[in-house]
């Protein structure tokens, strides 16, 4: 799909195209925080490899069309996203919506504790979807160069601290139970956003404010 879209953007002389990538394009063992120049400097995370390769192909295709045909195609790499209309299915949701559902359900049912996988020590970065949209619009208006641009907040938080923040926002008074027998995953995943900052953009929605917004939208859901 992406190859057809990029090619047809060239054929129909689209003035500008923004390709949306993913932070999984970076090597599994890349230094933290992740800088744009770390692309293709090492092996990818095996579980994400096919998806990551497709995204990398899109980035390189945009750069090639820029080089060969002068197309104004740019690429951006967002960090972990959250916000309205997220997926709350505990079988396949991401960590933040899963925690929100767990704490809301526990509060409503009066459960004494909420269980979470692993030790809670891994760190992750979270960007509100509205901030991503604002960054993309800004870059469409101001950025006209090859290569990619990371979009994130430049700060991370441990999963346990995230759970405690969600607990506070939801108003759940029980306890949090970690399960060290379950896998923790990658220890840290943080985007270097110095390039984006130098271009004049910074995220506006704090993590606490963003989670509060989401909570207000979903707090009355009847999950059973």
Model-derived features with residue positions:
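C-terminal substrate-binding subdomain of Rossmann-fold SDR/epimerase-dehydratase oxidoreductases
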Residues: 105-224
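Conserved catalytic Lys-bearing alpha helix of Rossmann-like short-chain dehydrogenase/reductases
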Residues: 1-5, 14, 54-62, 96
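Short, conserved SAM-binding segment of the class I
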Residues: 1-8, 138, 165
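Active-site helix of classical SDR
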Residues: 40, 50, 54-57
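Conserved beta-loop-beta element that borders a ligand/cofactor-binding pocket
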Residues: 21-22, 59-84, 97-99, 108-115
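Flexible, glycine-rich beta-alpha linker
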Residues: 25-27, 49-50, 74-98, 122-123
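Conserved Rossmann-fold NAD(P)-dependent oxidoreductase catalytic core, especially the SDR/UDP-sugar
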Residues: 3-48, 74
